[in-house]
């Protein structure tokens, strides 16, 4: 069972990294970042259960990561809509806000 969960987590992480590297759209990059965070959470919970099932350190840490992901999921689209209003595009290479 441990191997199956770790393989699924590795696939999710790999898909997220590939999508984050190759995506040119910010919405797609945010979704890939969520995939990466979910894969990390799966690893935390799996290793916490495998190594010491009496202590809940991995589970608690995954709850913190879920809270951070929820904040990112709430703030990210707001930032994206602001960038879209100003630049009329959500492409990553056109979103340099330092120069106008």
From Swiss-Prot:
Gene Ontology annotations for the cellular component aspect, listed alphabetically: chloroplast thylakoid membrane
Record's bilayer topology term: Multi-pass membrane protein
A Pfam short name: Oxidored_q2
GO BP term, example: ATP synthesis coupled electron transport
EC primary class: translocase
Keyword Transmembrane helix in annotation: yes
TM segment ranges: 1-21, 31-51, 60-80
Domain of life: Eukaryota
Subcellular location, record wording: Plastid, Chloroplast thylakoid membrane
Coiled-coil segments on the chain, per record: none
Keywords assigned by UniProt, alphabetized: Chloroplast, Membrane, NAD, NADP, Plastid, Plastoquinone, Quinone, Thylakoid, Translocase, Transmembrane, Transmembrane helix, Transport
Molecular-function GO terms, alphabetical: oxidoreductase activity, acting on NAD(P)H, quinone or similar compound as acceptor; quinone binding
Signal peptide: none
Major localization class: plastid
Record's catalysed reaction(s): a plastoquinone + NADH + (n+1) H(+)(in) = a plastoquinol + NAD(+) + n H(+)(out); a plastoquinone + NADPH + (n+1) H(+)(in) = a plastoquinol + NADP(+) + n H(+)(out)
EC assignment: 7.1.1.-
Protein family: Belongs to the complex I subunit 4L family.
Function: NDH shuttles electrons from NAD(P)H:plastoquinone, via FMN and iron-sulfur (Fe-S) centers, to quinones in the photosynthetic chain and possibly in a chloroplast respiratory chain. The immediate electron acceptor for the enzyme in this species is believed to be plastoquinone. Couples the redox reaction to proton translocation, and thus conserves the redox energy in a proton gradient.
Entries under NCBIfam families matching the protein: PRK05715.1-2 (NF004320), PRK05715.1-4 (NF004322), PRK05715.1-5 (NF004323)
Subunit structure: NDH is composed of at least 16 different subunits, 5 of which are encoded in the nucleus.
Protein name, as recorded: NAD(P)H-quinone oxidoreductase subunit 4L, chloroplastic
Organism of provenance: Cucumis sativus
């Amino acid at each position: 069972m441990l191997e199956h969960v770790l393989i699924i987590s590795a696939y999710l992480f790999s898909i997220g990294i590939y999508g984050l590297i190759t995506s040119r759209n910010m919405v797609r990059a945010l979704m890939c970042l969520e995939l990466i965070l979910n894969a990390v959470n799966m690893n935390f919970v799996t290793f916490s259960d495998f190594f010491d099932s009496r202590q809940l350190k991995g589970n608690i840490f995954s709850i913190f990561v879920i809270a951070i992901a929820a904040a990112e999921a709430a703030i990210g689209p707001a930032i994206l809509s602001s960038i879209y209003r100003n630049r009329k595009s959500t492409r990553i290479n056109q979103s340099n806000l330092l120069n106008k």
